[in-house]
Design a protein with these regions (language model features):
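A hydrolase-biased, glycine/serine/histidine/acidic-enriched motif that marks catalytic-domain neighborhoods
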Residues: 1-268
Length: 268
C-alpha cells in the first residue's frame, strides 16, 4: 500500500497511447489499478502514484499531497496532455492533481472517477481515528456479522482495537500491528485533508463511473455523482453506470470487465 521509493510504480509498459496515472484509494490501496489494468484494452502504459513511505511526514493539505505527486508524473511524462484516475475517496486526490496541473498551464485530457464521494460526503470525517477505524471494520463484514464488532471500544488504543478486530475475524491476522497503526494514522489523516478540500470547477470533462447497486442497509447511502453535481454544478460530468456496489464493482471480475470496457470507451 505504501511505497518506500520516491517514484511512480509501473503497472503496465508499452502502448501507442498516452499513459494513465492512477492514485491509491482512500485506504492507500492501489491493488485495484493492477487488477483493472489487466482488463483495459486501450494500448497505453499504466502507472500508480503511491503515497509516501510509512513514517514520512504527512502532507499539510491535499493540495500539498498533489504537488508531491506531480514530479512523479512528469518524471515519466514531462508534458501533457495527462490522464489521471482514482477510485473511492482517492479520486479527490486525482481531482486535486488535475487542478494543480491545469494551474501550471498543463493540459489534462482525461480525469476518471470510480465511485468517488464528494469531499463533503466523506464518511466519518468528523470522527476521531478510533471511531473511523471501527466503522471501516464494520463496513467490510457482512450485515449479519456486523453486530459482533459492537464490542470494539473507542476508549481502547488503536493497536488494541486492531488486535480485537483480528480476534473477531474482521482483520488480517498476518500483519505487523505497529505498522498497521502507522498506516491507519496516514489513512485517517488523508480522510481529514480530503474532506477539507474545496474543489473549484475545472475546464475539462469528468468521466464518472459509478456503482449501479445500493449499499447494504447497515451502511450509509450516498449519492456519489449527485454530490459532485451539487458541489460543482458547472462541471461537465459524463456518468456511466457499472454493475455492482462500491466494492464489488471492482472486486467482481465480471463487473470489473464492464468497468474496463467503459474506461476504454472514455479513453478513446
Amino acid at each position: 500500500m505504501f511505497h518506500p521509493h520516491a517514484g511512480a510504480i509501473t503497472v503496465r509498459v508499452g502502448g501507442s497511447e498516452l499513459p494513465v496515472f492512477f492514485v491509491p484509494s482512500g485506504l492507500a490501496d492501489y491493488s485495484y489499478a493492477i487488477s483493472l489494468a489487466q482488463q483495459i484494452r486501450v494500448s497505453c502504459p499504466i502507472h500508480v502514484l503511491p503515497w509516501s513511505a510509512i513514517g514520512d511526514p504527512l502532507p499539510h493539505s491535499i493540495e500539498d499531497m498533489a504537488e508531491r505527486m506531480i514530479p512523479l508524473i512528469q518524471a515519466i511524462q514531462p508534458e501533457g496532455p495527462y490522464r489521471i484516475a482514482g477510485y473511492s475517496s482517492g479520486g479527490i486526490l486525482a481531482y486535486t492533481i488535475a487542478h494543480a496541473l491545469i494551474c501550471k498551464e498543463e493540459s489534462v485530457e482525461f480525469l476518471g472517477f470510480i465511485d468517488v464521494p464528494a469531499p463533503h460526503d466523506l464518511l466519518y470525517k468528523n470522527k476521531d481515528i478510533k471511531h473511523y477505524f471501527i466503522e471501516h471494520v464494520k463496513a467490510v463484514v457482512s450485515e449479519s456479522e456486523c453486530h459482533k464488532f459492537d464490542i470494539l471500544n473507542k476508549g481502547d488504543e488503536l493497536a488494541v482495537l486492531i488486535k480485537k478486530a483480528q480476534k473477531l475475524g474482521g482483520y488480517d491476522l498476518n500483519v505487523d500491528i505497529s505498522l498497521e497503526t502507522v498506516k491507519w494514522q496516514a489513512i485517517y489523516h488523508f480522510s481529514q485533508i480530503a474532506g477539507a478540500y474545496e474543489p473549484l470547477p475545472l475546464p475539462i470533462k469528468l468521466s464518472y463511473f459509478y456503482a449501479a447497486e445500493r449499499e447494504p442497509s447497515h451502511l450509509p447511502q450516498i449519492d456519489m455523482v449527485g454530490g459532485w453535481r451539487e458541489l460543482l454544478p458547472d462541471l461537465e460530468i459524463c456518468s456511466v453506470s457499472i454493475p455492482g456496489r462500491h466494492v464489488s464493482m471492482m472486486e467482481n471480475v465480471s463487473n470489473r470487465k464492464h468497468l474496463a470496457e467503459a474506461f476504454d470507451r472514455a479513453l478513446l
